[in-house]
């Protein structure tokens, strides 16, 4: 059975306007500790190590001030997300500068499908400027939780579906990124959004 949204993220795992340090290692360590503190992991040190090991292979900074450090790990028993909106942005390797919106995603080692699915949903949601704006202006963790409930939970997509179209025009687009899978999902969502905007009928 797929995990429910309530088992993936809780308001206790959401930090707003937090100063978690000067480096991405500091941020990862702090969020791993937070995940342990709320009972989602029994080994924050191992969790931080596994996230950092994945980060060392390929930076997880994304355009727009976002980072999604992630890993598959034995330090947790079920998929978990923690979120921090940083008061002091930190460099996660994105070309456009440091990140202030940090999502840590960790799934069990035997949960490859769940890991990929969650990463896909999260990355696709974060393509949209309105989502980023709401994350940056949210006043409390509950507001963030409700915002993310769409793409991560079972309540459907964050944005309403595109209107029905006729089948006269068919478009095929292929995207891929050697940097990381999250970039690929974000590119795919951007392509789909461009088609919706430019081919309304």
Where are these regions (language model features)?
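Cytosolic covalent-transfer regions centered on His/Cys nucleophiles
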Residues: 1-201
């Amino acid at each position: 059975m797929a995990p429910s949204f309530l088992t993936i993220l809780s308001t206790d795992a959401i930090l707003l306007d937090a100063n978690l340090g000067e480096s991405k290692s500091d941020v990862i360590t702090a969020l791993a500790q937070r995940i342990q503190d709320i009972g989602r992991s029994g080994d924050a040190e191992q969790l931080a190590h596994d996230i950092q090991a994945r980060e060392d292979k390929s930076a997880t900074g994304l355009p727009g001030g976002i980072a999604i450090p992630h890993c598959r790990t034995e330090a947790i028993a079920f998929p978990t997300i923690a979120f921090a909106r940083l008061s002091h942005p930190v460099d996660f390797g994105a070309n456009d500068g440091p990140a202030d919106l940090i999502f840590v995603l960790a799934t069990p080692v035997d949960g490859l499908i769940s890991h990929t699915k969650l990463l896909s949903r999260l990355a696709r949601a974060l393509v949209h400027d309105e989502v980023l704006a709401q994350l940056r202006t949210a006043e409390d963790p509950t507001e963030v939780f409700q915002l993310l409930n769409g793409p991560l939970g079972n309540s459907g997509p964050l944005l309403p579906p595109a209107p029905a179209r006729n089948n006269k025009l068919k478009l095929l687009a292929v995207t891929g990124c050697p940097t990381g899978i999250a970039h690929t999902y974000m590119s795919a969502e951007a392509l789909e959004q461009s088609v919706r905007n430019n081919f309304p009928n």
